């Protein structure tokens, strides 16, 4: 808002900038309304009882037992005050045979200890177990509801990062709010009520006077809770935004690396962290202020009580024991009310976190895959009709896709949809799958409106194979099995056979059990597609939707898959979306779509009769390129070319669905792993990892010393020192309070005149203590909040920086997937804060309490002090054992939940695939399986913690009994006086209170150790190929000569599959080299190696004769411009995406001219917001062709010396393809260019064509030379194209 006051402050400025002011004000207005909306969002919470909406009867039983335990445990202290009053009178009134009387009271203490032990056990284990169970249920319900949402929800309301963030972060907050904290709150409440009941029974008059301070207490407490809740949700919002940055960056790490975008990602992330830091500090300061006020009120009410109590002893005949019983009962009662604040803040945070989650859980989508309503027929014929359909994508309501679109497809026929990129072809597929409903008009199957069918059933009759196949992080077998519930291995094998996948599957070390990696990154595009086809075959659908299904395959697999598809297309209604006209020739009907209208339809031969028709023009466009070749070849080429026309376009769902926000991350997420189309993979990756885990758990890489973590807080040392001083002051307050109490006890048994003077004096001292605490508390929490929040910010920032600079191979490991790392950054950093800041405060406070306690005790009576001290180790041992137990569990639980969140991450990222295969239940089963382990651990932890917790109370009360008994003996023997006994007792019990508080922190500190280990594992790992390293050579003038000498290479994640052995290739400056070969032969791996995503295992790669390892990495990557098969765009404006190529510093004119060069300017200007159009998560708001053009503009803007085109034009329709190819031809001039392609037209004109097979280059030369080698590999590849096309 500063900018606003700046504008309105100075009238001269106003006149000068009236124009800009108006714009700014408009912006401000927009910001304000956005801000208001956000604020509105921030403060929404659910009512507390609603947190338990998902409890079952067993949970209720546990919660009832827990509640009874909490009440019993809470009454322990008030009952103790009763015994305590008896003790004081026993000591104070009898100067002889004290021991007798005292021992009777001491025995009661022991019984009280036993009762409290049982109650505390019930309390903690009841609440911890029910909390764990309910949180698990909420997690799975949330995922279940997310999976049932309609696709529009994913386009508009959420993204993968947010879902995983909520599942890992918010459920922790919710669990915190309904687990042991509820028990603690009930316990404190019981103490409060019990204390006051006892006080009233013993002496109502004094109690009433003390009660006058309660309204003040309550007000202070309430204020505290409100402030905490407000600031907590503000911080969460900022962290959620930061989590999205992590997800985007890691999900597209190859793009980030290639465009040296690490700095940008880091500064973007840090921006969100700063906001969260500020919120955290405010939260800390306000908490302290609230606590300080509470203590001030408490101590002042003491002062009042002491003074008034003295009066009552003189006037009303109260005894000293009675007065103290009342004071302490009221004190424990009200103190316990003050201690509820951490519980209240946990409740508030949980309620805020639950709001968004529960809102989602209750959301009923318009298109509901779980709904059992709707028709279920015996079978369908498969007539499809779109009738007068009007449609816009929900995420882009102002761009009309269809206006009155109609199309009829009769059952058993094949209809092909052709047209330019973005014309709405794939939208037809989305509507038939019922991913969306049209705004007007109907989609009918067999004459019945699609909306009338039961969604799950109708989807089970429709098979979808799309352009970007989405696989799940599971084995190949599991992936195929998505096609059919409980498919047998035989059926799966048969489907793989039909889809021509069994050849490459059999070659893999684990066969069908090979893991495919996150989003199938361990397979090449062609391999992924064949598995997707097998999955559709297994489903045996009535209606088959092929959205560019064979585009990602090389000629050989394409031919066989096409055959497989032809086989399964028989007697099915088939809708084919294709750019490549060869794919569509044999269709029964071809419909040409242009700008959301059907402009022509008919069979191939019919449509060709009209030479001016749209179809003929499309054909002509595809054939123009070949006019320079002789007629025969032209004939052949047209077919190949068109055949390969989109050959690499990896996917369609994404693309054109993407037109409307589709494929939310489906593929593009990892697209670049396509780089090596590595043919095999390693199932080992995942399995081995599990085996390792038994020997050296990955979750606890190595123990991290607390000093190392503390070192991260070094810059805050001054703040920490101030905080520690305040904490020490806070620690001394309680023991001093003990001295005051014992002095008051003595005063109560003095002669009247002395009694009057003494009570007035001590009352004033109590008030002084109160004012000390209103200074010390806020100081402590404020300073520690600064240090703690800075630490969280620093850890997140350092870790993220480290992660972004890791070599690309690191991200191929399953435990470094974007979901897991996102969860690590968000949860672990916060947990570590507990270890340094918050528990340091607690530790300093406890130490100073203990030291002060000991000094006071030894000065009062050293014999008794030793006896009481002998008891303290018992209390400490109990605390220590408790810590040990807690430690055992949290490590595994963390890894297990990490695996579960990967399942969620996968499913949400591929929501269209999950929906079209009705795989929601399957995903849920996988998820619950992964959650079973952590669940059991949580329960075990609850039981063990309960025992530890109960035992500490038993020890506490027994040691009280022992110390008073010994004190009585000492008084009888004349070794000490009764007020000294109380001084020792109070000093040490206040210290013990401090100890028991610190053991209550233990769940946090044991989690923090594991978190620290996992964070430092990242920080300590040196990136093998680190772009942030500034050393290395920089060449002044890059010519662009590239040479690969004797290169051997295996992907680090798949050490058993050799990609290259002894590969040699030299590329002269300014020349264009095309790499061809089958899918999985390693063509894209060359590009990955040139950008140093990986380093070869042996051999070397040079640029202008200099080995690239010796060059500065960042500089090297700036010399290369990469345009790849699945372009990854960031969820920013088009302008920002293009500028990304130049590190975000490109000028407007550079951006526009690169867009013009890449033929993107035209469509961008046509968009409502032009260059300021947001492209959506992973660019889903643009069609594939549009995304690709933006990606080319991004590569061109950095003016690279070496251009790497990995199937760059494959996703475009003929027209854009031609123009982009022109653009590429223009920018290829004087640049060394490496082209990876399946399509012949793209590579024919290359200066050199290199054919890669079995990891070596088997042929190279110009097209004309290679085509004439008899039985040559190239010639046979070309021949394949021709036969496939004809």
From Swiss-Prot:
Residues annotated for ATP 2 binding in this entry: 1077-1084
GO-annotated molecular function: ABC-type xenobiotic transporter activity; ATP binding; ATP hydrolysis activity; auxin efflux transmembrane transporter activity; auxin influx transmembrane transporter activity
Residues the record lists as binding ATP 1: 419-426
GO biological process, one term: response to auxin
Residues where Phosphoserine is found: 671
Domain ABC transmembrane type-1 positions: 63-349, 720-1007
Keywords tagged on the record: ATP-binding, Auxin signaling pathway, Cell membrane, Glycoprotein, Membrane, Nucleotide-binding, Phosphoprotein, Repeat, Transmembrane, Transmembrane helix, Transport
Subcellular location: Cell membrane
Region (Disordered): 1-39, 625-669
Bias (Basic and acidic residues): 18-39, 625-636
Glycosylation sites (chain numbering): 94, 97, 500, 571, 666, 816, 846, 1131, 1230
Gene Ontology CC annotation, any one: plasma membrane
InterPro entries in the cross-refs: AAA+_ATPase (IPR003593), ABC1_TM_dom (IPR011527), ABC1_TM_sf (IPR036640), ABC_transporter-like_ATP-bd (IPR003439), ABC_transporter-like_CS (IPR017871), P-loop_NTPase (IPR027417), Type_1_exporter (IPR039421)
PTM remark: Phosphorylation level varies significantly during early response to bacterial elicitor.
Residue ranges with Low complexity bias: 646-669
Protein name, entry field: ABC transporter B family member 4
Organism per entry: Arabidopsis thaliana (Mouse-ear cress)
Organism taxonomic ancestry: Eukaryota, Viridiplantae, Streptophyta, Embryophyta, Tracheophyta
Originating gene: ABCB4
